[in-house]
Regions:
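Charged interaction scaffolds used for protein-protein
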Residues: 1-10, 51-54, 58, 78-152
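A structural signal for alpha-helix termini and helix-coil/disorder junctions
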Residues: 28-29, 35, 74-78, 115, ...
């Protein structure tokens, strides 16, 4: 949980149950932390081209302001009864007062999510671990097999 002051008023940002129950927000964060945002439009996800990586990076960076706006709102939901419109106005004031951009705000929010256990509570960490394990199992070394020699 992070305590912030906006326009002279104190607020608490907390990424707990309210945040973890927002499907849209969990989806946004999964796309970013898993790296899926980088490759989701690639023709061949196993072998992305440099163009695919550039386009994926552009998409990911351009999603950050929306993620921040949604994240600020869901972070406030647990302890502060504000509407999404009010949360957006508070976020803008907070950014102006602290002279930060969206990239810095995203890092602050993500750090708060980690400290609050959002990634574990939402299932993102468990899913990423399962995906990594599945990836390891698919890539079984083949050097234990005998090489075939073709003699005709």
């Amino acid at each position: 949980m992070k305590e912030i002051t906006v326009n002279g008023n104190d607020y608490k940002l907390e990424f707990s149950f309210e945040a973890a129950e927002r499907k849209d927000f969990v989806s946004m964060m999964f796309r970013i932390v898993s790296g899926a945002a980088l490759l989701e439009d690639a023709v061949d996800m196993e072998n992305p081209t440099p163009k695919d990586m550039i386009n994926g990076t552009i998409n990911m960076v351009s999603d950050i302001p929306h993620i921040c706006r949604t994240g600020f709102f869901v972070g406030l939901m647990e302890n502060n009864p504000v509407s999404e419109t009010e949360a957006k106005a508070l976020m803008k004031s907070y950014m102006k007062e602290n002279k930060i951009g969206y990239a810095d705000l995203y890092e602050d929010l993500r750090k708060c999510m980690e400290e609050d256990g959002f990634f574990e509570l939402s299932g993102i960490t468990k899913t990423l671990n399962q995906l990594a394990e599945n990836q390891k199992q698919r890539k079984v070394p083949q050097d234990h097999k005998q090489k075939s020699t073709g003699t005709k």
